Amino acid sequence: MKTNEQAYEDLLFERDEIDSRILRLSNFIDDVHNISKLSLHQKILISIQLQAMKTYKEILTARAADIAIYSSKNSK
């Protein structure tokens, strides 16, 4: 079973990985000079993927904060 500290570190690592993916996707969007040539379907999929990753990052951040609060309460 993971300790709170291990779970916290795992969440932060996963959050950083998601942040990296968000940055890569954002850069891809910026680098595509002919974004207007993408189909509406492709634009919608990219938008959904980007929003899903941002939401997941927020969830990971909240879970990490919960663990930090729980750990600090139990260490007193």
Residue ranges and their predicted role:
Residues 1-76:
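Extended, charge-rich alpha-helical interface modules
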